[in-house]
Amino acid sequence: MANVSKKVSWSGRDRDDEEGAPLLRRTGQPDEETPLLNGAGPGARQSHSALFRIGQMNNVELDDELLDPEVDPPHTFPKEIPHNEKLLSLKYESLDYDNSENQLFLEEERRINHTAFRTVEIKRWVICALIGILTGLVACFIDIVVENLAGLKYRVIKDNIDKFTEKGGLSFSLLLWATLNSAFVLVGSVIVAFIEPVAAGSGIPQIKCFLNGVKIPHVVRLKTLVIKVSGVILSVVGGLAVGKEGPMIHSGSVIAAGISQGRSTSLKRDFKIFEYFRRDTEKRDFVSAGAAAGVSAAFGAPVGGVLFSLEEGASFWNQFLTWRIFFASMISTFTLNFVLSIYHGNMWDLSSPGLINFGRFDSEKMAYTIHEIPVFIAMGVVGGILGAVFNALNYWLTMFRIRYIHRPCLQVIEAMLVAAVTATVAFVLIYSSRDCQPLQGSSMSYPLQLFCADGEYNSMAAAFFNTPEKSVVSLFHDPPGSYNPMTLGLFTLVYFFLACWTYGLTVSAGVFIPSLLIGAAWGRLFGISMSYLTGAAIWADPGKYALMGAAAQLGGIVRMTLSLTVIMMEATSNVTYGFPIMLVLMTAKIVGDVFIEGLYDMHIQLQSVPFLHWEAPVTSHSLTAREVMSTPVTCLRRREKVGIIVDVLSDTASNHNGFPVVEDVGDTQPARLQGLILRSQLIVLLKHKVFVERSNMGLVQRRLRLKDFRDAYPRFPPIQSIHVSQDERECTMDLSEFMNPSPYTVPQEASLPRVFKLFRALGLRHLVVVDNHNQVVGLVTRKDLARYRLGKGGLEELSLAQT
């Protein structure tokens, strides 16, 4: 522990020497004492009010599975919320990615014959096909609505600008532009801030956390999908520096989570299909497929979608899952391609593989030479530095928002302010620019003439007066001479800060396209410089360097290498640039990691989520399970009184949602581990009143099936909603049939990296720590492991907080 820099000590182990373990008194009979074996030592017991304390914290904010959201007390909003990035929130619960192999589960698995097994496998493939189809259709809907609304907006503004350019009074055009932008963003931010805040942003950090095993409330609900789709349409049409591609990953994940369950808890509709997949383990795999399908629909990159899900999302992987994810990705991009081709009148052409099509790069005209490799590496360095600056600025901006802009009304006002400022800055730059280019050969959809001569257009408007996707394609493919260096330099500088300010607003939006647009702008500027230095050599094409700059900037911000390389290759339909794109992305990641972590990881950290990386901190071998585990542990007996179980579940201090089950022995003998049972299982048992009247009787006649637990999943009722009479409190509950009789355990002397590897690789929620006699001495949960991380000064232990 010498190398551990402790910030605040919250672990219950620090109080072991200070507190004794008082007795738990039986509810309703104060003169009797009922032993509640806590496993902290031979015969150890503790009071009901002190069960499972985490340090000195007595109150823990419960997740939505514990509290009824309809009866939660109203939130109050202080003027400032103190926030420290060295915190780990207790409000997040873990998902059960390890199946509880109790008697019910094993009996069902034994009944599955070869035919039933094949049926389950076929259902998996059918679900993946449905995920791909629906994700593709949602992407089509977003694209068509954005194209029509944005086209209408830009036509109205263009006509207004053309009108007032001749007669004067362009300030009215500015007012119209800012008003239209603010109106769209107002609606988009209101529905996010007041209806479903988890729909804000791209959703990629939240999906990463879900696949990592963290339960993010409402992240894969139908309402979230509706708000996400509506919000991203309004954000893009509102002219913000955002893209619609990132949120497709979140949308695909929500679709996958819903389809795989065969019901909608939001709509209270159960279609009685796919019931076998109603558990976290199965849902996780389908959400991985949904994330990949979202990438595939966004960029027309099915292989890139699979690699994105592997690199950024899925924490657990196997060969069969790879095939199903690839299948969902291919179906998604084909559905999008087919529907958009019909919409554009080219039914048999299939020319729209993704929401954004970078266009084909001519390999012969734009081939690279060996002496350009150092130039590409230099561009990667620039992208890494600019990405680090972007992330650092966004970090401090997000900290400011957490502390001061936490009221929904303030969040809406900020979003409208950013929309108005974006329109104003764009108008001022377009108005001030005298960069006029010939209209002939231009790909601009809404060319603005302003003060240019007839037959010319303002090139600054080509970057600002368009959707970001079309602006990226223009920078890639417009012929040399379409932009002058001053225009590109000003656009890069201004759009960089606008995109940084915009990311983190309470709107549904992504950072993929803004990053590509910034990089394409300074990359094209880089290409113009190379062309000037080499005397307009044929290989110094600005479009090629715009592509490399876009890859460098995006890689410097999000720090993805493998998946981004393939996505860029598939989106450009050109394998030639695979090697230079990989070099650029790797260089950008290496350089950026020197200064600050990637944008998604940074926001996960700012939200204090107990996210587990692939490996434990490299300097953590000096720590053992004894030092990181939570103690004392609330244990239950095989045959436990209903009143005790109700009291344990009602006690907010015992909020680990899992309880070791120990053998029922005499008070003087040690309690050995027999199994583990989850809070959700106990809730279902109490709801169905699986009691016996006297402790010497067997189970009641009514036998629970695994279906009863699946029907309650995933929104288990809160303990407060289950009525247990005084007579029922005196009954006994036999946990033998429902507990997991073979939970994973580790000895006290196991090192932290070994505990971490076991916990992380198996997707555990609880890991029981036992002594040499198999007595429970502690419990390791996700938060116990996540609070150790490698800081600049060595190994740090994060503080635990309620929010």
Swiss-Prot record:
The keyword Lipid metabolism does not apply. ATP binds at residues 656-658, 781-784. Residues 204-211, 286-298, 302-310, 543-557, 558-560, 561-572, 573-576 dip into the membrane without crossing it. Keywords: Antiport, ATP-binding, CBS domain, Chloride, Ion transport, Lysosome, Membrane, Nucleotide-binding, Phosphoprotein, Repeat, Transmembrane, Transmembrane helix, Transport. Slowly voltage-gated channel mediating the exchange of chloride ions against protons. Functions as antiporter and contributes to the acidification of the lysosome lumen and may be involved in maintaining lysosomal pH. The CLC channel family contains both chloride channels and proton-coupled anion transporters that exchange chloride or another anion for protons. The presence of conserved gating glutamate residues is typical for family members that function as antiporters. A motif (Selectivity filter part_1) lies at residues 201-205. The keyword Membrane applies. It catalyses: 2 chloride(in) + H(+)(out) = 2 chloride(out) + H(+)(in). This is H(+)/Cl(-) exchange transporter 7. The lineage of its organism: Eukaryota, Metazoa, Chordata, Craniata, Vertebrata.
